[in-house]
UniProtKB/Swiss-Prot annotation:
Residues 155-175, 296-317 are annotated as: Disordered. This is TOM1-like protein 1. The gene is Tom1l1. Its main location: Golgi. Residues 442-445 are annotated as: Interaction with PIK3R1. A motif (SH3-binding) lies at residues 421-425. One of its GO terms (molecular function) is protein kinase binding.
Length: 475
């Protein structure tokens, strides 16, 4: 791009560069010919209005150079008189008026009183409107806000003096350029300002009292009625008051622009705020009415939404009486109990014991094992079922003791066939563990003296241990 500037720089465009040169502080006086050339470019190019407003905003924003501000205001004044609505509508936006021009009134910029009055005159004059349907609502809002803050605007009749001073600075200004007074005669009413006499002020106050009364009635009706259960007579009256309030608000806005009396202006601003709140309340009321009517037109949808639970039915708790459901995890346990309860311990069931290291008192071991078992697994296990026909004479009697049948320590037949126990499998962990341990000859082994066998038990134990040791050594 020309001049080595980025596209975001407002001065990068050809029009922006012209505005930068025309408002430079090194220029002694306004170059009206250059100003007219800028106006022609704005009117003949599509992006001219946007580029011009961006360049002017950059020149004015945070600028402490009074000369550049004065030249920029002169260029704005000429462009507003000679450019079309596309440029004028951008200038009267709140973004430019409030965020750019009004900020120059801050005391830190120390603008001369003449320059400050010129800015205020622009705001007041623009708020009165332009031909061509330019929306001036935003600049009018800024004007009313300044009035509310107590800012005193200079009369528009004083603008010719300002222009006359500007003419003295530049005697070479072309005569074809219209001045501010000519603009006022074109776009402003014949009587831009009104000086109210006491009779007019009294009549205005009476009309404002009527507006206040209407606002109170509207507020009371809105508070007493709710959408869906409203009184038709009240609603009809409310509609009439709303229509009248809209008309009164337009008149108040017009009076705020032309009335010079400060006390009257303050009163108009206050009444306008109250009336605006009542109008907004009525519009909110009508929106709620419309929403209720739409819901009544679709009652099925409303019923469906109201009857739907807040959570899925599968997640809701059933607080009613429910029959107890058996827990599935207890099924295997109950089946095991049923199988074990049918067993008879005194029958020819295999009993797994440690054949190599039997206890000295197997009956006491059984008692200890019965104390450690889970009672629910053996509900039908009693001392009568475990009673045996063989007992020891030298063993002390216990009230709850249960005696076992004698068990042989070898696989050879040492008892009648009816009392014989089946041998353990060769891969049983008991036999595997015993095969890894050397034989011990110092353990006292107890045997049943009543058993019908005469074979030496110790020899067979030694033989079995030796066989296990040999197999272990071979591995």
């Amino acid at each position: 791009m020309a001049f080595g500037k980025s596209h975001r720089d407002p001065y990068a465009t050809s029009l922006g560069h012209l505005i930068e040169k025309a408002t430079f502080a090194g220029v002694q006086t306004e170059d009206w010919g250059q100003f007219m050339h800028i106006c022609d470019i704005i009117n003949t190019t599509q992006d001219g209005p946007k580029d011009a407003v961006k360049a002017l905003k950059k020149r004015i924003s945070k600028n402490y150079n009074h000369k550049e501000i004065q030249l920029s205001l002169s260029l704005i004044d000429m462009c507003m008189q000679n450019c079309g609505p596309s440029f004028q509508s951008l200038i009267v936006k709140k973004e430019f008026v409030k965020d750019t021009l009004v900020k120059l009134l801050n005391p830190r910029y120390t603008l001369p009183l003449e320059t400050q009055n010129r800015i205020l005159s622009f705001i007041k004059m623009w708020s009165q409107g332009f031909p061509g349907g330019v929306d001036v609502s935003e600049v009018k809002e800024v004007y009313l806000d300044l009035l509310k803050k107590g800012v005193q605007f200079p009369p528009l009749d004083g603008e010719p003096e300002t222009k006359q001073e500007a003419g003295q600075i530049s005697p070479s200004r072309p005569t074809s350029v219209p001045t501010a007074p000519a603009l006022s005669s074109i776009i402003a009413p014949k009587n831009p300002t009104i000086s109210l006499v006491p009779e007019q002020i009294g009549k205005l106050h009476s009309e404002l009292d009527m507006v206040k009364m209407n606002v109170k009635v509207m507020t009371a009706i809105l508070m007493e009625n709710t959408p869906g259960s409203e009184n038709h007579e009240d609603i009809e009256l409310l509609r009439k008051l709303y229509k009248t309030g809209r008309e009164m608000q337009e008149r108040i806005m017009d009076l705020l622009v032309v009335v010079e009396n400060e006390d009257v202006t303050v009163e108009l601003i206050q009444v306008n705020e109250d009336l605006n709140n009542a109008i907004l309340g009525y519009e909110r009321f009508t929106r709620n009415q419309q929403r209720l009517l739409e819901q009544k037109r679709n009652p099925t949808e409303a019923n469906q939404t109201s009857s739907e639970p807040s959570a899925p039915s599968c997640d809701l708790l059933n607080l009613g009486p429910v029959a107890p459901v058996p827990v599935s995890s207890e099924g295997p346990l109950n089946s095991v109990n049923a199988q074990l309860s049918g067993l008879n311990v005194s029958s020819q069931s295999p009993v797994i014991t440690n054949n190599l290291y039997p206890s000295l008192q197997p009956q006491m071991d059984l008692l200890a094992s019965e104390d450690t078992e889970v009672p629910t697994l053996f509900p039908q296990r009693t001392s009568q079922n475990l009673a045996s026909s063989h007992t020891y004479d030298n063993f002390p009697d216990h009230s709850s003791s249960v005696l076992l049948q004698p068990v042989s320590l070898h696989t050879a037949p040492a008892a009648p066939s009816s009392q014989r126990l089946p041998p353990l499998p060769s891969n049983h962990p008991v036999l595997k563990n015993s095969a890894l341990q050397p034989p011990s000859y110092y353990e006292v082994m107890e045997f049943d003296p009543l058993a019908p066998t005469t074979e030496a038990i110790y020899e067979e134990i030694d033989a079995s241990h030796k066989k296990g040791a040999q197999s272990h050594s071979e591995c």
